[in-house]
Swiss-Prot record:
PANTHER family associated with the record: FLAGELLIN B1
GO cellular component, one term: archaeal-type flagellum
Job of this protein: Flagellin is the subunit protein which polymerizes to form the filaments of archaeal flagella.
GO molecular function annotation: structural molecule activity
Family per similarity comment: Belongs to the archaeal flagellin family.
Propeptide: 1-4
Protein name (Swiss-Prot/TrEMBL): Flagellin B5
Keywords recorded for this protein, A-Z: Archaeal flagellum
GO BP terms: archaeal or bacterial-type flagellum-dependent cell motility
InterPro entries: Flagellin/pilin_N_arc, Flagellin_arc
Compartments where located: Archaeal flagellum
Length: 275
């Protein structure tokens, strides 16, 4: 009888140990599964963060005038594309930072919150179509106040709003920064324009949210207004020869594209490949 009681007691202890082990195993399996999912999620996030981003393919500069050596670089075009494996990049949330060592300028695209009281619209600085000359604008090059496109009436409007082409984008960017308007909300806006170069899925077609996806190429168009020794663009501005320029094209998420070049010691052509 005593042996039977001992045997039953041992069996109860054994069953209890098995149950405890089963519960512990269940907890371990559940915990390991949770940790595995967290690790995979973190890995995906890290991979996306590393892979996502924008790259600068080339940077070109433009010097106005028949004798380029007598002038500065007044306009830049940056050709950008997403990194391999990157998700979509909304250029409306991209910032372009450029420094010449003396000053640092931050360019942006149209912002509906910032520009809601302005006459500027995203359609005025966004171009889709064939590009015969990305710097097409020289006949209007406004180095002094009061120079307007042929047939343009500054008393009625200050932006080109119809039949937007490359020249119109340059003009509208110029007008947004310089006081060519009676609307004080349309002054000092340091914007960049966008020209669609390659867009297989039409993700860049949206003027409000032009987005870079795999294989897309966009041209970011900007004036070098801030690089002016007397803060008066009307009498000349831009990047002079032998200037070290650094900066970044910064997306909302992911790695930024690097801008790093030195302007030539002399300017011999109107269009220069800088990077």
């Amino acid at each position: 009888m005593r042996r039977g009681a001992i045997g039953i007691g041992t069996l109860i202890v054994f069953i209890a140990m098995v149950l405890v082990a089963a519960v512990a195993a269940g907890v371990l399996i559940s915990t390991s599964g949770y940790l595995q999912q967290k690790a995979m999620s973190a890995g995906r996030q890290t991979t996306q963060e590393v892979a996502s981003g924008i790259k600068v393919l080339n940077v070109y500069g433009y010097i106005n005038g028949s004798t380029p050596g007598a002038h500065n670089i007044t306009r830049l075009v940056l050709y950008v594309s997403p990194n391999a494996g990157s998700g979509g990049i909304d250029l409306a949330h991209v910032k372009v930072v450029i420094s010449d060592g003396k000053r640092m300028a931050v360019y942006r695209y149209y912002d509906p919150n910032e520009d809601k009281n302005s006459d500027i619209q995203p359609a005025y600085i966004h171009y889709t179509g064939d590009i015969a000359n990305v710097f097409a604008y020289e006949k209007w090059e406004p180095y002094y106040k009061g120079k307007y496109p042929t047939g343009f009436d500054p008393n009625n409007k200050f932006y080109i709003t119809d039949n937007i082409d490359i020249s119109a984008v340059w003009w509208n960017l110029y007008s947004a920064y310089n006081k060519t308007s009676n609307n004080d909300k349309d002054y000092g806006k340091l914007l960049f324009g966008i020209a669609v170069v390659q867009d297989g899925d039409e993700s860049l077609d949206s003027e409000n949210h032009p987005s870079l996806s795999w294989g897309d190429i966009a041209a970011i168009m900007l004036w070098t207004f801030p690089f002016d020794d007397n803060n008066n663009p009307i009498d000349g501005f831009g990047l002079p020869p032998s200037t070290k320029v650094t900066g970044k094209v910064i997306p909302e998420n992911g790695a930024g594209g690097v801008i790093d070049f030195t302007t030539p010691s002399t300017y011999t052509d109107n269009i220069l490949e800088l990077q």
